[in-house]
Swiss-Prot record:
GO molecular function: flavin adenine dinucleotide binding; mRNA dihydrouridine synthase activity; tRNA dihydrouridine synthase activity; tRNA-dihydrouridine47 synthase activity; zinc ion binding
Gene Ontology CC: cytoplasm; nuclear periphery
Function: Catalyzes the synthesis of dihydrouridine, a modified base found in the D-loop of most tRNAs. Specifically modifies U47 in cytoplasmic tRNAs. Catalyzes the synthesis of dihydrouridine in some mRNAs, thereby affecting their translation.
GO biological process: mRNA processing
Organism listed in the record: Emericella nidulans (strain FGSC A4 / ATCC 38163 / CBS 112.46 / NRRL 194 / M139)
Compositional bias (Basic and acidic residues): 83-92, 267-284
Record EC number: 1.3.1.89, 1.3.1.-
Location in or out of the cell: Cytoplasm; Nucleus
Active-site positions on this chain: 418
Catalytic activity: 5,6-dihydrouridine(47) in tRNA + NAD(+) = uridine(47) in tRNA + NADH + H(+); 5,6-dihydrouridine(47) in tRNA + NADP(+) = uridine(47) in tRNA + NADPH + H(+); a 5,6-dihydrouridine in mRNA + NAD(+) = a uridine in mRNA + NADH + H(+); a 5,6-dihydrouridine in mRNA + NADP(+) = a uridine in mRNA + NADPH + H(+)
Binding site for FMN: 311-313, 386, 458, 500, 557-559, 581-582
Gene symbol of the encoding locus: dus3
Lineage of the organism: Eukaryota, Fungi, Dikarya, Ascomycota, Pezizomycotina
Name listed for the protein in its UniProt record: tRNA-dihydrouridine(47) synthase [NAD(P)(+)]
CDD domains associated with the record: DUS_like_FMN
Length: 714
């Protein structure tokens, strides 16, 4: 077969592929255990491994095609904050380039040529609800006309049966469903007329009842009502705790400013005599006390058996997280939400808080978790929210409304690692690494208003390569800064810290610095176990104000791509757990490998089955109508832009694979494996059409790299 994994044009099989056979009709390849190095069967000796190049076996290598292939590493920032990068206006009068990144992406809109009136969507043909607009309504009222002229034909994927109706016994899209023929009938009325009606399956509905007590009928949690979002938009929902604590921070900031300008800080920082210490205590008494103490938090546990899926903007959507949980992810996070849109009731931002009920269930932990004081696994859950902001008043307000409106959160995490320029220039994301005092105030305030939900933080090594400051920052967050010592308000109360082993300047170039992560883990261990040995004993925190009974958890993040990487980081870097980002996007079964402790050589048909599941879960989340399928297709293609980088384990000379290795041009063991490794946007579209049918004429897909852009032709 001709072609490459990067540039392939093959016929799409029409049979149902995920049923146990691949495109060649062969059964799926078995999961095998492979060890490093894999030997070259023909030569008897493996060639040396080249740094930065994926070591693909010679029999799978092919000549470089004439037409060059766009680089894919430029999309890695998309996993951090693509949606917010897209908001930035890059039009500065320069001539448009045909290469580089698409920074202002649009995706068109998939919709019916004329919509069906909402009064008809769920009603039988002859007994619709009354339309409040009457003859002035701009939508179609005649059901048969809508089905015949304005709605595209039913899809024949999934054997023509609506995935939503199949899972729940009821389809929320009603007559707009692209599979409506599978849950509608034409019945004869008493007067002899034929009427179209929707049908439900009561047996399926009973089986589909949510497992989690507070889950909605569709199996989701943290769904915010329209009334609550409207109240936020109209500023009718008060945040008394956040307001009071913000006012206190404002007041004490002014009091401390007078203190520092008065020249007393040097004397108080090193009290030599009893009189000096007494004066320091008297100075403390002059400051305004905090309006209230933080509530007692749920205890957390992080361990080797709890790998975490990182917060992934755009790619970390509900269907993908649901798939990862099914494959063994024990902890998940929402896509990063901005604080200001949250407190303004912005619908898209609140939609990020929705989680599947499987994410609201407790993580699977070992007996080791029982040694954590007061940890109750039955009250724990997998899903946490991540927010970003540049003002402590905003993040505190967002934390308070999240705590009251979405109580099914494991943690609320503050993003201090996003490298995107737009957020950095606004003072949020990784900009907070250079504002330790401000960051400490944010976390202390969030901890004060979050009720029982613990507060965590995700950071990078620093903003610049040559000046890492994460370790100084970690010490401040665990023990409290000098201002906290003066106010006698204790440490920030952060329950867990995640460190991405790269600087902001580094972005995703070069490998993550796990040596620095290991040093930070050792520092945190010392701070947790021997805080009384810290040189500045005045700053030693009170135990009652420390999270988890005095233990701050530590997670490492960066370049984890196999169970070997994971085990190495746990054993040698001494982190409590590892957060996985791009590795899970490229191969979501990484969590299975971690559980099994071995490589899993997934066949093309097995990997395609994951695509099918994503399509099913996408339609359950966004709907099976034209619009919902368009949204599902868009996010499926976003995922495939990462998944196409996977080079099957069976094709490699050396293990473990490395996430930053760039493969030479290669072919798979069969046509489908080659297709799934293609970096050509047209092949991503073909894969999506296997389950979602042909794209709508107005559908438009712009990946992060311009050379891969796709626009349908009407």
């Amino acid at each position: 077969m001709e072609g490459t994994a990067q540039n392939l044009d093959v016929e799409v099989p029409k049979q149902d592929l995920p049923n146990g056979t691949d495109s060649t009709g062969e059964p799926p390849l078995k999961k095998v255990r492979l060890e490093e190095p894999a030997s070259d069967q023909q030569n008897g000796q493996a060639p040396p491994r080249l740094k930065g190049v994926a070591p693909i076996k010679a029999e799978f290598l092919i000549p470089k095609p004439k037409q060059g292939q766009a680089a894919v590493s430029s999309t890695d920032d998309a996993a951090e904050a693509a949606a917010y990068k897209d908001r930035e206006d890059e039009k500065k009068g320069k001539k448009k380039k045909t290469t580089g990144q698409n920074k202002n992406r649009t995706f068109g809109r998939s919709q019916d040529s004329k919509g069906l009136c909402a009064s008809r969507v769920y009603s039988p043909e002859f007994s619709p609800a009354e339309c409040p607009f009457g003859d002035k309504c701009r939508f179609e009222h005649d059901l048969r006309t809508y089905l015949k002229e304005h709605k595209r034909e039913d899809l024949n994927t999934f054997n023509g049966v609506c995935p939503v109706w199949s899972a729940r016994g009821k389809c929320d899209a009603g007559w707009k469903c692209r599979f409506v023929g599978s849950h509608s009938i034409e019945r004869v009325t008493e007067d002899g007329r034929k009427e179209l009606v929707l049908v439900e399956d009561e047996e399926r509905r009973k089986k589909a009842q949510p497992v989690f007590p507070s889950a909605a009928e569709d199996g989701t949690v943290n769904t915010t009502s329209p009334a609550d979002k409207i109240a936020l938009a109209k500023r009718q929902r008060p945040t008394p705790r956040a307001d009071a604590y913000s006012d206190w921070l404002d007041l004490t900031s002014k009091e401390l400013e007078k203190y520092f300008h008065g020249g007393q800080q040097n004397k108080d920082a090193h009290p030599d005599t009893a009189q000096d210490k007494e004066e320091k205590e008297e100075n403390r008494a002059t400051y305004t006390e905090a309006p209230f103490m933080p509530s007692e938090k749920r205890r957390l546990y992080f361990g080797p058996e709890t790998p975490a899926l990182a917060p992934l903007t755009t790619q970390g959507n509900l269907p993908f997280r649901r798939l990862c949980v099914e494959l063994g992810a024990q902890l998940t996070y929402s896509e990063m939400a901005l604080s200001m849109p949250l407190i303004q009731g912005h619908k898209p931002e609140w939609a990020l808080m929705r989680a599947h009920e499987t994410e609201a269930l407790p993580p699977t932990v070992s007996a080791r978790a029982s040694v954590v004081q007061d940890y109750d696994n039955s009250k724990d859950m997998k899903f946490g929210a991540q927010i970003a902001g540049n003002k402590y008043r905003w993040v505190m307000k967002a934390t308070e409304v999240l705590s009251s409106l979405t109580p099914n959160l494991r943690v609320i995490d503050l993003n201090c690692g996003c490298p995107i320029d737009l957020l950095y220039r606004e003072g949020s994301g990784s900009a907070l690494l250079d504002a330790p005092s401000k960051l400490e105030k944010m976390l202390r305030g969030m901890n004060a208003v979050s009720e029982q939900i613990p507060i965590t933080v995700k950071i990078r090594t620093g903003t610049r390569d040559n000046t890492p400051n994460a370790q100084k920052l970690v010490e401040r967050l665990i023990l409290g800064g000098h201002e906290a010592s003066m106010l006698n308000c204790g440490p920030s109360g952060v329950a867990a810290i995640t460190l991405h082993g790269r600087s902001r300047q580094q972005r995703y170039t070069r490998e993550a610095n796990w040596e620095y992560i290991s040093e930070t883990a050792a520092l945190i261990k010392r701070l947790n176990e021997k805080s009384d040995e810290v040189t500045d004993t005045i700053r030693e925190p009170e135990e009652r104000m420390r999270p988890n009974g005095g233990k701050t958890w530590f997670l490492g993040n960066g370049d984890c791509y196999s169970h070997v990487d994971y085990e190495d980081h746990i054993k040698n870097a001494k982190v409590d757990s590892v957060m996985v980002g791009r590795g899970a996007l490229i191969k979501p079964w990484l969590f299975e490998e971690i559980q099994a402790g071995q490589y899993l050589d997934k066949s093309a048909s097995e990997r395609l089955a994951y695509v099918e599941k994503f399509a099913r879960y996408g339609m359950e989340t966004w709907g099976s109508d034209e619009y919902g399928i368009g949204i599902t297709r868009r996010f499926l293609l976003e995922w495939l832009s990462f998944a196409c980088r996977y080079v099957p384990i069976g094709l490699l000379e050396y293990l473990p694979p490395k996430i930053n290795d760039r493969p030479p041009y290669w072919r798979g063991r069969n046509d489908m494996e080659t297709l799934m490794g293609s970096h050509d946007y047209r092949d991503w579209i073909k894969i999506s059409e296997m389950f979602l049918g042909p794209a709508h004429k107005d559908f438009k897909f712009e990946p992060k790299h311009k050379s891969n852009s796709y626009d349908t032709e009407g």
